[in-house]
Amino acid sequence: MSSQPAADDVIGCLAAVYDWAESFDTKDWDRLRTVLAPTMRIDYTQVMGKIWESMPADDFIPLASDPKFLGNPLLKTQHFIGASKWEKTSDDEITGRHQVRVAHQRYADSGMKEVAKKGHAHGGATTWFKRVDGVWKFAGLCPDIRWSEYNYDEMFGEN
């Protein structure tokens, strides 16, 4: 089955992807937990060289919130999602394809006045959604970084 999803289904997926992005950018890991499917496909090949075909949501939260990744309190991000296309792949699964720009700034200290490093990624992302108990949940992502600005490759880890 591959078809255009109903408008209500797309709206449900848009709500989930919005909350996913806002959760990342505000570091609101409790909010993130509310929109995740129980298991997820995480293809971070271009981000950290790893892929998880079936990651429990309870494992994704510590990955995302790790201080060496998005949980760094000195790191500010904006996951901006542009135009999207949607494909219904089963009664309870939808795939989204999006234009994406993710801005990153890491500050020198907790005063958040001096930018120590910045790096922005441009490209797309494939996202997956599953309907769980009648609600569309964020079930994974695969960023496609086509190009980057500044020091994107230095945004994460011990740098």
From Swiss-Prot:
It comes from Pestalotiopsis microspora. Dehydratase; part of the gene cluster that mediates the biosynthesis of dibenzodioxocinones such as pestalotiollide B, a novel class of inhibitors against cholesterol ester transfer protein (CEPT). The biosynthesis initiates from condensation of acetate and malonate units catalyzed by the non-reducing PKS pks8/GME11356. Pks8/GME11356 lacks a thioesterase (TE) domain, which is important to the cyclizing of the third ring of atrochrysone carboxylic acid, and the esterase GME11355 might play the role of TE and catalyzes the cyclization reaction of the C ring. Induction: The expression of the dibenzodioxocinones biosynthesis cluster is positively regulated by the transcription factor dibT. One of its GO terms (biological process) is melanin metabolic process. Belongs to the scytalone dehydratase family. The active site is at 79, 104. Its EC number is 4.2.1.-. GO terms for molecular function: scytalone dehydratase activity. Homotrimer. Each subunit contains an active site, located in the central part of the hydrophobic core of the monomer, which functions independently. It is an enzyme of class 4 (lyase). This is Dehydratase GME11372. Pathway: Secondary metabolite biosynthesis. It comes from the Eukaryota. Pfam families: Scytalone_dh (PF02982). Keywords: Lyase.
